[in-house]
Amino acid sequence: PRFYRWLWEIEHEIRAHVPMVYYHVWDNYPYPKFNAPWYNSNDHVACISKLTHDVVQNVAPEVDSSYIPHAVDAEIFKPWEPDAIEEYRSARNLDNKFVCFWNNRNARRKQSGTLIFWFKEFLDKVGHDKATLIMHTDIKDVHGQDLEAIIHELGLTNGQVLFSGDKVSSADLAAIY
């Protein structure tokens, strides 16, 4: 809520014309009682997790709230049959490899470059042909590190680290998972 104080400072002007709904996530306990004024400045708080819903219900029980799961389509993101997995891995030269998948924004706070350094240390122990790291991200994000430069600097240019930077369909993303 701290990023939107300006909005809640004018909530009486907004709510006179339209309801205010806050789509919210809060990740941990203890209850953030200091958020009560912000929660109560909404007509509804839509909570992304059960924990968030519990927080809102306990910090501001008088505000209307609901739990709206932050989730994926279970018809797309579901377990595959072993034969389909084997075929997918084989088509990408991932047979008999330990595969790690990182699906994230390449932002410094996400430690994307550090992950590659750690992965190299892992490969140095198990063998560079035994594992692959797939990173679904923008390798040259202005808020991140130059991941391509890092893999070159570390000598990880033989398929140890693979990048998937294009926008992909949910089905294609589910396949990687």
Each language-model region and where it sits:
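An aromatic- and histidine-rich active-site surface loop
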Residues: 1-15, 28-34
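Nucleotide-activated donor-binding/catalytic signature segment of Leloir-type glycosyltransferases, i.e.
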Residues: 13, 144-171, 175
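A conserved, positively charged/aromatic
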Residues: 15, 22, 32-44, 176
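Short hydrophobic "strand-cap" motifs at the C-terminus of beta-strands
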Residues: 23, 48, 68, 102-104, ...
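A short beta-strand/loop micro-motif in the catalytic core of glycosyltransferases
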Residues: 41-50, 66
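Carbohydrate-associated surface elements
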Residues: 51, 71
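A short helix/loop element that forms part of the nucleotide-sugar donor recognition site in Leloir-type
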Residues: 78-93
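Conserved donor-binding/catalytic core segment of Leloir-type glycosyltransferases
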Residues: 94-110, 116-119, 133-134
